Amino acid sequence: ETGVKVVETAGNNPAKWLPQLQDAGVKVIHKCTSVRHSLKAQDIGCDAVSVDGFECGGHPGEDDIPNFILLPRAADELEIPFVASGGMADARSLVASLAMGAEGMNMGTRFIATKEAPVHENVKQAILAASELDTRLVMRPLRNTERVLTNEAVERLLEKEKAMGADLK
């Protein structure tokens, strides 16, 4: 009804939504952080996958496989189209993604810093000022890893994770 042509799913198996979406003419791209998950998405009928390397902001999965390894493997094993995701920022990212077999690329964090994004200017400036050394991985002990821009709260969380060790559940 609203004209949505493509939906990206992530985090859980999208099988229960596929019939309704595809019957409505919507293409389903499932975000995957491993080739094994990408193959599962292909097997259940997803139209494409977004292969998300360890470089990504947000949830990089638990396998820690960067795009220079992940994308060629996906190209070798998948029969459905895939786009590269994770750490993508500009034309160089696109050229590299295409060279590794992707049909295109997906940028997430990069768009937070655009003038169109409804995000506070301080957040945009923090992203623009950040270097490759300014992110941290949190929630690893819970196997729900997230890559986040570091700040004092993140550093406190990491200290708490370290202090709690095996007691963190």
Role assignments for model-derived ranges:
Residues E1-L78:
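Active-site entrance/lid segments in N-terminal catalytic domains of soluble metabolic enzymes
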Residues G61-V83, A89-K169:
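Conserved active-site-proximal phosphate/metal-binding subdomains
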